[in-house]
Amino acid sequence: MMNIFTKREGLVLRESFSSIQTPHSTSNVLWIDLLHPSPAEVSYISQIFHLDIPTKEEREEIEQSARYWEDSESITINTYFLVSLFASTNKKDLHNETVTFLLCKDILFTIRYGEFRTFDEIQNKVLASPKNFQNGYDILSKIFEIRVEQDADMLENTAKDTRGLRSGVFGNQFGYDELLENLSRLQELNMRIRDSLFDKRRAITALLKTDKADIEVKKNLTIVLKDLNSLVEFTTVNMNALDNIQSLFSSQINIEQNKTIKIFTVATVGFMPPTLIASIYGMNFDVMPELHWEWGYPLTLCLMVISTMIPILYFKKKKWL
């Protein structure tokens, strides 16, 4: 699907694909948003605007030169946008989707294969306040601003869930399986947010060095960059909190294991004396006079009980139990 935004008589209009198929129809184009574009759409846009649109393989490369490059006429940016639901426990719903931004002759081209609330919001803003968007750089700057705000909201929700998980550990509100699942989910989400923030910070840092963007755009991007730096630091704090929960979880497991081992150890030591007594009288030699005593059997049982109680009472006195 292709959304085309053109500027006419002080207004921004959303138009169809046919609006750029006539001669000189591209002069008023402000932004072309390609959502799940077909090969034919990509090819047509490349030809009519003389663009070198990166392939899917090029979009997913992680080296710096593949995430941002600039020539005399255009700027290409590939950056991560996180696709996730806050409460989702299905890891398949959690991933970073690469969005491509192309800036050429003050026109913004976006190529994306995922639906983001960011783009719905920016489209409404562009249509409602056309004076604030004179060229593609203004739109790109606003997209980054909106997206970083949404990343901040997502990070705040992650931090809230982290605090709840920590309280649950101390309150024994979770079983081990549930706790481990929630911990893994939050660690994964925090890592994905961090990757997304790092990628945007790298793109904006490079964009601030270009001479193609005007001063106002750079001022806005500088503010966004400061917010990004704060959020990156927050992800570090959140990751440390999650690591602390993991340490508490591991310590709790060790304590439970030690308690179990202690019980078995006490039981083993406690039953050693009666076992020894039973073994002695189980030999059944004729020369063992106790075997022929009338009270030999009950006395032996009493002796076994007493020999069991003595080590247990000793352990309690030493506060080992």
Curated annotation (Swiss-Prot):
Keyword Ion transport attached: yes
Annotated motif Probable selectivity filter, positions: 282-284
Alphabetically ordered keywords of this record: Cell inner membrane, Cell membrane, Ion transport, Magnesium, Membrane, Transmembrane, Transmembrane helix, Transport
UniProt catalytic activity: Mg(2+)(in) = Mg(2+)(out)
Membrane topology qualifier: Multi-pass membrane protein
Superkingdom of the source species: Bacteria
Gene Ontology cellular-component annotations: plasma membrane
Subcellular localization: Cell inner membrane
MF term (GO), any: magnesium ion transmembrane transporter activity
Transmembrane segments: 263-283, 295-315
Residues annotated as site: Essential for ion permeation: N258
Database matches in InterPro entries: CorA_cytoplasmic_dom, CorA_MIT, CorA_TM1_TM2, Mg/Co-transport_prot_CorA, MgTranspt_CorA/ZnTranspt_ZntB
Role this protein plays: Mediates influx of magnesium ions. Alternates between open and closed states. Activated by low cytoplasmic Mg(2+) levels. Inactive when cytoplasmic Mg(2+) levels are high.
Family membership: Belongs to the CorA metal ion transporter (MIT) (TC 1.A.35) family.
Annotated domain remarks: The central ion permeation pathway is formed by the first transmembrane domain from each of the five subunits. Mg(2+) binding strengthens interactions between subunits and leads to the formation of a symmetrical homopentamer surrounding a closed ion permeation pathway. Low Mg(2+) concentrations trigger both a conformation change within each subunit and a loosening of the interactions between subunits. This results in an open ion conduction pathway. In addition, this results in a less symmetrical shape of the whole complex.
Subunit record text: Homopentamer. In the absence of Mg(2+), interactions between subunits are weakened, and dimers, trimers and tetramers can be observed in vitro.
Name of the protein this chain belongs to: Magnesium transport protein CorA
